[in-house]
């Protein structure tokens, strides 16, 4: 749990960098911080957290449905909690379950266990499940201490894979050839039923931190 606390702080920092500090301080966006794990949820129930996520997504959705919804090899709104438990058990991956079994956080996940192009083990993968049926609605990864070269190569590969599935992003800033992580890199997609964010930046004491997030944005999935 202590490790997940620093993940919360890192995830919040990356969210602010990629989504914009101004947006995160709008009243309607405050629940977004909860969804991203950037602020504590206290004693909020799983249903209350899900409602906060639903409100936040209203400001993030695009207008058109996504041509695909890549999610690191999982299927949004189809993959179940039991499916992910089985995936983790088959690979001897340690996971913690919380929030009334709507949050599963797995640690030290090999990149080849996921459809991810990150070039080193992933520190933590968080799976969020819909309250009513425990189906997957959000998968987020966080990897710290990535070398500039590996981060740039990983980022380019992830961006290329998303572009192949989804086309041009809504917004992006790819790492330049000589990149040290001080200027954040990001790729952002916004659809009526799907949101994807990939980001990388240098953070004090953690080196370059990479984050991938793939989320259902449909009314049924949010």
Model-derived features: where do they sit?
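N-terminal secretory signal peptides that target proteins for export/translocation
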Residues: 1-2
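Non-cytosolic coordination micro-motifs
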Residues: 5-9, 17-104, 138-222
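N-terminal post-signal-peptidase region of extra-cytosolic proteins
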Residues: 67-70, 107-116, 122-124
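Extracytoplasmic
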Residues: 122-126, 134-136, 184
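Hydrophobic/aromatic beta-strand elements that line small-molecule binding cavities or substrate pockets
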Residues: 125-130, 196-200
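Generic detector of bulky aromatic hydrophobic side chains
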Residues: 127-130, 135, 151-154
């Amino acid at each position: 749990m202590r490790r997940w606390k620093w993940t919360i702080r890192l995830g919040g920092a990356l969210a602010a960098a990629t989504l914009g500090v101004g947006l995160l301080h709008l009243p309607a966006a405050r629940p977004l911080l909860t969804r991203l794990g950037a602020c504590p949820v206290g004693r909020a129930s799983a249903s209350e957290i899900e409602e906060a996520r639903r409100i936040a997504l209203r400001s993030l959705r695009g207008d058109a449905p996504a041509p695909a919804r890549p999610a690191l090899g999982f299927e949004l709104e189809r993959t179940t909690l039991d499916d992910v438990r089985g995936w983790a058990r088959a690979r001897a991956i340690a996971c913690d379950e919380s929030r009334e079994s709507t949050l599963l956080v797995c640690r030290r996940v090999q990149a080849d266990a996921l459809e991810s192009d990150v070039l080193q083990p992933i520190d933590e993968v968080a799976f969020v499940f819909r309250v009513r049926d425990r189906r997957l609605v959000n998968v987020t990864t966080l990897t710290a201490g990535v070398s500039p070269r590996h981060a740039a190569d990983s980022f380019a590969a992830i961006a290329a894979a998303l572009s192949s599935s989804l086309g041009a992003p809504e917004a992006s800033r790819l790492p330049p050839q000589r990149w040290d992580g001080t200027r954040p890199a990001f790729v952002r997609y916004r659809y009526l039923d799907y949101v994807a964010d990939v980001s990388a930046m240098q953070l004090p004491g953690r080196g370059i931190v990479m984050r991938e997030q793939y989320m259902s944005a449909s009314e049924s999935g949010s």
